[in-house]
C-alpha cells in the first residue's frame, strides 16, 4: 500500500497501453430520438437541477480523460450569450472513420450511448461515459459547437437540437490536444429558465478538484460584462477536502488521518478527522459520483473502524472487561470522513442508483482501513486515546438518550391520548392527505387554529426557546420541550429510532414571522430536522410558509405582497394615491380569515419546498451558521452581505 494515488493511476495508464483511443473504441448501443421527448429520463428533470446536469455531463467526459491519465486542466466558462464552454487538454474525441461509415466524432455527438467506455479499452475507469452525456447535451441544446484538437489539426462540428448543422471539418494546425464543447441550453426544454447559477457550478467543480488530486479546474463567468474567475487545484486531494469540511470546527487532532491503496484495480482513497462536535459527516464517492445512499465501500469502512477502535480500547485497557463494546454510532460521533473509490465496473443500486453494490469493494476497503488505522493508533497513542474516550462519552450519552426516549414512550402509553396537548390535530387520518403547521407563539397559533381547514390541517404552536441542536448531544436535545413536542406530533421517533413510515403528516410547514427572529427560528428548526430527522428533508416533506409582508387596500380591493420589490411593483401598477398600507410585524397581527387567504389556503398560498441539493455544502453551512466559532460566521456574513436585507448582529 506504499504507492500514492498518482502513482497508481499512472501505472494504470501504462497498463492500459497508453492504449490508442481511436474510432474503433466507440460502441453504438442505441439511438437519440427519445431524449427530447423525455428529457427527464436522461438528466433527471428539466428544472434548474437538470439544466446544471448538462454542464456536469460534459465535464464528466473531461474527468474521464483525467482518470485515464491524459488530462490535467479543465476550463468551464459561462459566456455572455448564455452558452457554456467546457475545454480540456485530454486526447480529444476520436475523429477517424467509424465502422458505421461516419467520423467517430459525429457518432459520439449524435448517438446515445456511443462512447469509449463500452469496449473496455478507451477508459479503464469512468464516471460519465464519454458520448452518453455529450449526445444528450446536444439533443437538449438550441445549438452546440465542438472543436477537437487532435493529430495536429482542429476538427469542428456544429449541431442544433440533436441534428447536425455543420459536418466535421478539419482545418489549421496545432500541437495541442483536447476537446472544447460550447452549448446553449434550449428554452423549449428548460421552460423554467436557462440561466446557469455560478454558485451551484462552483460547488461541484470544487468537489471534483478535491476528488482528483492535482487536477486544475477553472470556472469563469463572463456574463453581465464582467469577468469572475476561480481556480480549484488541490495537491492534497481529499485530505484538503476534509480540512475544508472541518473549517471552523474544534478538532480532536489537527492532522487528517489518510489511507490510500489499490487491489484488483480498485483504487481506494480515504481521509478522516475527528472534531469535538456531535454530528457524523460521511461522504462517499465512486468514480467521482456522490453515492448518497452509501453502499459496500461505506460498509467496509464502518466495520473496520468499529472493530479496530474496540480492539485498541481493550488492548490499552481504556475499555474495561465489564464494559460493553462501543457501537458504530459511538465511534463515528464527531467524525468527518471522505471515501473515494475508483472501480472499473461499478454496480449501482438503490432508489436513486447512488448505492455501490460491488461486494468485493467491502473487503478491499475493510482491509485497507484496518491496516492503516492500526498503524496510526500505534504511532499516535495520545490521539488514539482521545478518539476512544470521545466514543465512550458518546456511548454514555446515547444510553441517556435511549432512557429519555423510553420515558417519553412510557408516558405516551399511559396517557389517554399520546399526542401533545398543544397540538390542534386534524380529522383526516391518511398521512398523505394531511399537513402540520409549526407556528411560533400562542397568538399566531390561535389565529392559525381558527383559520385552518380542520379536516386536513393540524397546528402545533411552539412555546419557549428552540434549542440550537448544533451545539448539543441528543440526550440534551431530548430535554427541550419544543423538540419533544414535535417528535411526538410527527410520530416518527428521532435519531437512530427515526422511522419515516410512521410520519403522521406528509407536509410539515414551518410558519414564522417574516422578520429576523422568525428567520432564526426557521434556521433552528431546519438544523434539527437536518441533523436528527434528515429523511424529512431528503424526501421532500418540509416546507416554509410565505406569509405576506404588506396588505394594500385601495377602494374595496385588498392586495397582499410578499417583499419590498413586489410591493413597489404593485403600487406602480395601481397608483399610490388612495392606498392604505399595513405592514405585518408578525403572524399574530392577522385575523384568521386573512391568515387562511394569504398563507394557508392551498389554492392561493405560496410555499417554499426545502430540498437538499448538496449535502456537503448543507453540512458546512449548518456548522458555520450554528456552530461555536465566530470567525467563520463573520467571514460568511461579509461574503454574502450584499444578498441580505435583514441582518441581526
What positions do the PLM features span?
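Residues immediately C-terminal
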Residues: 64-65, 92-93, 516-517
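GHKL-family ATPase ATP-binding module
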Residues: 1-22, 32, 56, 64-66, ...
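C-terminal interaction appendages of subunits in large macromolecular complexes
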Residues: 396-415, 430-435, 446, 450-452, ...
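Short conserved segment of the HATPase_c
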Residues: 93-115
Amino acid at each position: 500500500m506504499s504507492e500514492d494515488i498518482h502513482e497508481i493511476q499512472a501505472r494504470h495508464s501504462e497498463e492500459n497501453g497508453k492504449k490508442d483511443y481511436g474510432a474503433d473504441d466507440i460502441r453504438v448501443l442505441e439511438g437519440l430520438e427519445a431524449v427530447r421527448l423525455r428529457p427527464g429520463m436522461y438528466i433527471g428533470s428539466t428544472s434548474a437541477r437538470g439544466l446544471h446536469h448538462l454542464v456536469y455531463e460534459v465535464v464528466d467526459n473531461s474527468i474521464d480523460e483525467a482518470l485515464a491519465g491524459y488530462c490535467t486542466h479543465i476550463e468551464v466558462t459561462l459566456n455572455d450569450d448564455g452558452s457554456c464552454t467546457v475545454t480540456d487538454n485530454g486526447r480529444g474525441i476520436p475523429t477517424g472513420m467509424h465502422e458505421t461509415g461516419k467520423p467517430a466524432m459525429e457518432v459520439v455527438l449524435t448517438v446515445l450511448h456511443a462512447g469509449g467506455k463500452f469496449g473496455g479499452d478507451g477508459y479503464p475507469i469512468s464516471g460519465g461515459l464519454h458520448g452518453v452525456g455529450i449526445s444528450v447535451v446536444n439533443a437538449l441544446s438550441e445549438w452546440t459547437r465542438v472543436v477537437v484538437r487532435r493529430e495536429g489539426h482542429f476538427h469542428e462540428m456544429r449541431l442544433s437540437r440533436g441534428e447536425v448543422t455543420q459536418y466535421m471539418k478539419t482545418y489549421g494546425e496545432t500541437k495541442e490536444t483536447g476537446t472544447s464543447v460550447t452549448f446553449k441550453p434550449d428554452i423549449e426544454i428548460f421552460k423554467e429558465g436557462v440561466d446557469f447559477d455560478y454558485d451551484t457550478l462552483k460547488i461541484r467543480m470544487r468537489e471534483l478538484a478535491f476528488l482528483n488530486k492535482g487536477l486544475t479546474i477553472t470556472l469563469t463567468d463572463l456574463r453581465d460584462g464582467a469577468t469572475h474567475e476561480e481556480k480549484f487545484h488541490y495537491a492534497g486531494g481529499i485530505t484538503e477536502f476534509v480540512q475544508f469540511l472541518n473549517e471552523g470546527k474544534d478538532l480532536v487532532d489537527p492532522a487528517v488521518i489518510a489511507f490510500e491503496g489499490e487491489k484488483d484495480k480498485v483504487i481506494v482513497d480515504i481521509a478522516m478527522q475527528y472534531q469535538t462536535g456531535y454530528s457524523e459527516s460521511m461522504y462517499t464517492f465512486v468514480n467521482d459520483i456522490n453515492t448518497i445512499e452509501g453502499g459496500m465501500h461505506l460498509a467496509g469502512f464502518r466495520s473496520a473502524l468499529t472493530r479496530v477502535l474496540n480492539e485498541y480500547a481493550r488492548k490499552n485497557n481504556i475499555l474495561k472487561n465489564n464494559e460493553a463494546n462501543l457501537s458504530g454510532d459511538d465511534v463515528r460521533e464527531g467524525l468527518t470522513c471522505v471515501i473515494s473509490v475508483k472501480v472499473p465496473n461499478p454496480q449501482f443500486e438503490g432508489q436513486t442508483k447512488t448505492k455501490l453494490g460491488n461486494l468485493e469493494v467491502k473487503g478491499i476497503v475493510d482491509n485497507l482501513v484496518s491496516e492503516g488505522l492500526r498503524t496510526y493508533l500505534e504511532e499516535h497513542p495520545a490521539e488514539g486515546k482521545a478518539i476512544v474516550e470521545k466514543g465512550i462519552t458518546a456511548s454514555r450519552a446515547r444510553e441517556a438518550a435511549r432512557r429519555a426516549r423510553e420515558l417519553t414512550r412510557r408516558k405516551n402509553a399511559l396517557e389517554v391520548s399520546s399526542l401533545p396537548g398543544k397540538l390542534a390535530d386534524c380529522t383526516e387520518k391518511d398521512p398523505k392527505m394531511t399537513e402540520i403547521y409549526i407556528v411560533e407563539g400562542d397568538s399566531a397559533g390561535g389565529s392559525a387554529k381558527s383559520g385552518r381547514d380542520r379536516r386536513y390541517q393540524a397546528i402545533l404552536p411552539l412555546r419557549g426557546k428552540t434549542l440550537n441542536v448544533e451545539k448539543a448531544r441528543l440526550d440534551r436535545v431530548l430535554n427541550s420541550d419544543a423538540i419533544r413536542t414535535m417528535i411526538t406530533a410527527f410520530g416518527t421517533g428521532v435519531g437512530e429510532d427515526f422511522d419515516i413510515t410512521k410520519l403522521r403528516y406528509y407536509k410539515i410547514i414551518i410558519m414564522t414571522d417574516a422578520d429576523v427572529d422568525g428567520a432564526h427560528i426557521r434556521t433552528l428548526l431546519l438544523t434539527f430536522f437536518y441533523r436528527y430527522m434528515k429523511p424529512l428533508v431528503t424526501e421532500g416533506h418540509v416546507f416554509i410558509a410565505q406569509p405576506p409582508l404588506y396588505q394594500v387596500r385601495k377602494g374595496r380591493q385588498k392586495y397582499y405582497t410578499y417583499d419590498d420589490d413586489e410591493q413597489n411593483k404593485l403600487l406602480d401598477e395601481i397608483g399610490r394615491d388612495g392606498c392604505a398600507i399595513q405592514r405585518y410585524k408578525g403572524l399574530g397581527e392577522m385575523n384568521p380569515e386573512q391568515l387562511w387567504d394569504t398563507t394557508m389556503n392551498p389554492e392561493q398560498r405560496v410555499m417554499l419546498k426545502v430540498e437538499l441539493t448538496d449535502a456537503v455544502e448543507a453540512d458546512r453551512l449548518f456548522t458555520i451558521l450554528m456552530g461555536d466559532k465566530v470567525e467563520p460566521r463573520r467571514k460568511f456574513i461579509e461574503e454574502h452581505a450584499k444578498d441580505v436585507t435583514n441582518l441581526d448582529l
